[in-house]
Design a protein with these regions (language model features):
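Alpha-helical transmembrane segments of multi-pass membrane transport proteins
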Residues: 1-275
């Protein structure tokens, strides 16, 4: 959610929305999501009486900052370049790759010629996956248009909502929370954006606001029990059972659902940074 976010780029390309504005729209919701997780962690920590680690010394903090400096500089370069109109979001991707290679080879010295080969292979594999998803989604959109199903769905949604943006967002949130458990964000955006965006325009909803709600929603869906994709990733890392993590995730899920409701029904949280 916090820029630079690939999901905002995907949504922007589908809905023909400004990616720069979408990046700005994601700042406050992203910070709210982070704050929600912090509050949940503090509550759980006090309830379980977890031990507090000793504070890091000034020397340790300075060392950690120096080690992380070049990595922290990347989002500054990307966002600064985009917001400063130095380069487009597409060009920012190329700049970030070049910067990452330079830092990895000459600063951290963790990238060798052999690793570059592996990186290129992994990049090709990832790109191919995304292209197949894009191809399928484009075909899906084409079939919707040719069969005029998009107009039928739009008419159905307008009848169900009765012209109410509140009811529309209730439907959007329920559908995406369920879809987010089973689908990755890119696939879900390609499937549902063409369905929801026209209805949102009919209801006078800002496409930037809709995109922010959809992406926050899908982020929550990724760790919503019982089948949230990120739950299984966390199980593999922590070497625990899905039942254990499902119980532990509840406070975080509640906090993020509260944030989702705030972002959904207070459009200013998404649009206040857009001049």
């Amino acid at each position: 959610v916090i820029p630079p976010s690939i999901t905002f780029v995907v949504y922007g390309s589908i809905a023909d929305a400004s990616i720069t504005d979408l990046f700005k729209a994601g700042v406050i919701p992203g910070l709210l999501m982070g704050a929600g997780l912090i509050v949940a962690a503090l509550v759980v920590g006090r309830k379980m009486d977890l031990k507090v680690l000793p504070k890091a010394t000034g020397k340790e903090r300075w060392k950690a900052f120096k080690d992380a400096f070049w990595g922290l500089l990347m989002p500054v370069i990307i966002l600064g370049g985009i917001y400063g109109s130095i380069f487009t979001p597409t060009e920012a991707a190329a700049v970030s790759v070049f910067y990452g290679l330079i830092v990895g080879i000459f600063v951290y010295r963790e990238i060798s010629l052999k690793k570059i080969k592996d990186i290129l292979i992994d990049s090709c594999s990832t790109t191919a996956t995304v292209m197949f998803i894009t191809m399928g989604a484009t075909l899906f959109g084409y079939v919707l248009t040719r069969a005029r199903l998009d107009l039928a769905i739009e008419g159905f949604m307008m009848n169900v909502t009765g012209g109410s943006s509140i009811i529309f967002f209730i439907i959007v949130n329920i559908v995406l929370l369920i879809a987010g458990c089973f689908l990755d964000s890119t696939s879900a955006l390609y499937i549902f954006t063409p369905l929801f965006a026209p209805v949102a325009l009919q209801l006078g909803i800002d496409p930037i606001h809709l995109g922010t709600v959809m992406i926050v929603n899908l982020a929550v869906g990724l760790f919503t029990p019982p089948v949230g994709v990120n739950l299984y990733v966390a199980c593999g890392i922590g070497k625990i059972k899905i039942e254990e993590i499902t119980k532990g995730i509840v406070p975080c899920l509640v906090a993020e659902l509260v944030v989702l409701l705030l972002v959904t029904y207070i459009p200013a949280l998404s649009t206040m940074l857009i001049g």
